């Protein structure tokens, strides 16, 4: 879910795309719905294919255009399930945004982290699981202290040049790490991250509101928030 999201108003149970607001993702030209559809925990573990498809279809009909996923969700099973659903629903590819994240791909050394090899392997695997030709958004799921940031920036730019991803970003990176990524990109004429995906809710505010303050101002990156309801705690769960 994007920060500052407002509720979608439903009128007479009909499709009401006009009630959904869309925001540019940072300084990019991509417009993302204020509400997004996530698949962490729920897909495979809690929802079967029929239930998941009903949820995705309902969200899409109400104007949600961003569907978020990751290689780590259900050990890739979440992307497999979403890919099956996308194929069945037959939405036009230019009407929705789909993402994946790279870091936790498996237990072996070459299946984890942000090395050039794993980034390329993870992207290709996500494309296959999701049954799409390209990813709109591709996130570094966490920072990797064992891989030079310049290697990660180069790997993401390779994928951009190949047309396998449209934008790349970070998730739960420190302001220092994001700044370094931009410094590397500027030095070697590469593209820096377009977005960051931090946790942000009333119980978790420090990083988003304070640590990232200068990052937002300096680099104008966008955000796609995870756990805006604190894993259900704020709903009274």
Regions found by a protein language model. Name each.
Residues 2-96, 133, 161:
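N-terminal binding-site loop/beta-alpha segment at the start of enzyme catalytic domains
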Residues 47-59, 113-130, 178-183:
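Short, acidic/polar
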Residues 108-139, 191, 199-203:
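Active-site gating/metal-coordination segments in enzymes
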